[in-house]
Amino acid sequence: MYAIIATGGKQYKVAEGDIIKVEKLGVEAGATVSFDQVLVLNNGQVVVGNPTVAGASVSATVVEEGKNKKVIVYRYKRKSGYHKKNGHRQSYTKVKIDKINA
């Protein structure tokens, strides 16, 4: 059984027991969160939502919050001596999928 959920502007294919990194949710570790935007549900038969599956949700437990590896952004313009170097670390929340509620 799997589901495709939408959170943080992205879509994730999840099954029970999976651990995934999603965009920062702003809740502490150990808290339970529910994802209500279920786009596709497969429990032997595929159900496609329009745009979401009515009455379906996915419950998960927050494992941790953190930051990804640093991404270096480097810009320059030739012949003018313009150089700019920035770094960015995107925040994430790691969640463990507990149950897919159909």
UniProtKB/Swiss-Prot annotation:
Domain of life: Bacteria
Coiled-coil annotated spans: none
GO cellular component annotations of the record: cytoplasm; ribonucleoprotein complex; ribosome
GO biological process: translation
Keyword Transferase: no
Pfam families: Ribosomal_L21p
Keyword RNA-binding: yes
Molecular functions (GO terms): rRNA binding; structural constituent of ribosome
Alphabetical UniProt keywords: Ribonucleoprotein, Ribosomal protein, RNA-binding, rRNA-binding
Family, as annotated: Belongs to the bacterial ribosomal protein bL21 family.
Function: This protein binds to 23S rRNA in the presence of protein L20.
Protein name per UniProt: Large ribosomal subunit protein bL21
